[in-house]
Regions:
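P-loop NTP-binding core
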Residues: 1-217
Length: 217
């Protein structure tokens, strides 16, 4: 979805220059910048695209990594093949990884120094996110047992899709008990803007609410 919102034409058809391909091909810094890093609709923000097909790579990443990257730790690939090559070209590098328990997520743990976890207050989503957070130490141990190093300096939870409702306030209070000082004070509100701006491939900052079809909120 980040690819679609930031540069929607990169989400149409087959995209070969994705993060997953860059990880496996271990291209040079120059090739990364020339072929994989793409400018977006937002000035000063670049993106390496992702695609649906990357999920198939994730499902068999260990096999592919052993074939294309013999001798390299499969959980260090993102850090060594992409982040280390680009870290001096950008002030911030954001890794947008879903909570799927696969090699891509574990690569994200190794490559990141700060981990942000959005927590929706809806009961089922809230419960599953807390379960995910509960499993983090186990996932970190699994990654380090494989020979990788977790260098995370901080892990923050924050509320997302929150409205002025009593059950949402209760969820926020519970998350504060779980995270303590490691909870961001700022929350993302439940807003039609987040759902509708994508229809025009805009953002909540670039699209005027009065142009949301069928909704004025």
């Amino acid at each position: 979805s980040a690819t679609m919102f930031m540069k929607h034409d990169l989400s149409i058809g087959v995209v070969d220059e994705t993060v997953a391909q860059a990880m496996l091909q271990n291209v040079s810094r120059e090739e990364l910048l020339d072929e994989f890093v793409k400018p977006t609709n937002v000035s000063g923000v670049d993106i390496i695209p992702a695609s649906i097909e990357d999920a198939f790579i994730a499902s068999q990443f260990e096999k592919l990594a052993n074939e294309h990257l013999p001798g390299q730790n499969i959980y260090d690939v993102l850090q060594e093949n992409i982040i280390n090559k680009l870290k001096y070209d950008y002030d911030f590098i954001f890794i947008d990884s879903g909570p799927h328990l696969d090699a891509f997520l574990l690569n994200s743990f190794v490559a990141a120094d700060t981990f942000l976890i959005p927590v929706p207050p809806a009961q089922v989503d809230f419960h599953s996110t807390l379960k995910f957070m509960q499993r983090l130490p186990e996932l970190f141990d699994m990654t380090e047992t494989a020979g990788s190093e977790i260098k995370l300096s901080s892990i923050f939870g924050y509320m997302a899709k929150i409205a002025r409702k009593s059950d949402h306030a209760d969820a926020q209070s519970l998350l504060r008990e779980v995270c303590g000082a490691d909870m961001l004070d700022t929350s993302l509100p439940l807003s039609t803007a987040f759902e509708r701006c994508g229809e025009s491939f805009g953002t909540v900052f670039s699209t005027n609410p009065k142009f949301y079809p069928g909704d004025r909120d």
